[in-house]
From Swiss-Prot:
UniProt xrefs under PROSITE patterns: RIBOSOMAL_L14 (PS00049)
GO cellular component: cytosolic large ribosomal subunit
GO terms assigned for molecular function: large ribosomal subunit rRNA binding; structural constituent of ribosome
Family membership: Belongs to the universal ribosomal protein uL14 family.
Function, in words: Binds to 23S rRNA. Forms part of two intersubunit bridges in the 70S ribosome.
Name listed for the protein in its UniProt record: Large ribosomal subunit protein uL14
The organism's place on the tree of life at top rank: Bacteria
InterPro entries named in the record: Ribosomal_uL14, Ribosomal_uL14_bac-type, Ribosomal_uL14_CS, Ribosomal_uL14_sf
GO annotation terms (biological process): translation
Subunit field text: Part of the 50S ribosomal subunit. Forms a cluster with proteins L3 and L19. In the 70S ribosome, L14 and L19 interact and together make contacts with the 16S rRNA in bridges B5 and B8.
Keyword rRNA-binding in annotation: yes
UniProt KW keywords: Ribonucleoprotein, Ribosomal protein, RNA-binding, rRNA-binding
Lineage: Bacteria, Bacillati, Actinomycetota, Actinomycetes, Micrococcales
Keyword field contains Ribosomal protein: yes
Amino acid sequence: MIQQESRLKVADNTGAKEILTIRVLGGSGRRYAGIGDTIVATVKDAIPGGNVKKGDVVKAVVVRTRKQSRRPDGSYIKFDENAAVILKTDGEPRGTRIFGPVGRELRDKKFMKIVSLAPEVI
């Protein structure tokens, strides 16, 4: 359950290490984001020479959450950390590599490029 002010690890090679959620997209009163949901965030920690700098406002998609997520078959999935992948304006990932596993829900939400770059889809 990602909400405003939540901090997430960045799971790609854009140069950002941590982002802070500004807004959950998808409706005016939407409070929480789960796996596959898009957020607006600001970069809180970045490495020198990366594609993004500290203070940049970016869009990102949530790929891992600590809060368990219920699937249609009745099973639950949860991860050890909250993580996101930074997106371009057209919805494609800004980085060229994805680190760590991602949820299968991304395939249903049409983030096929992220699914294909990820080392593991759970």
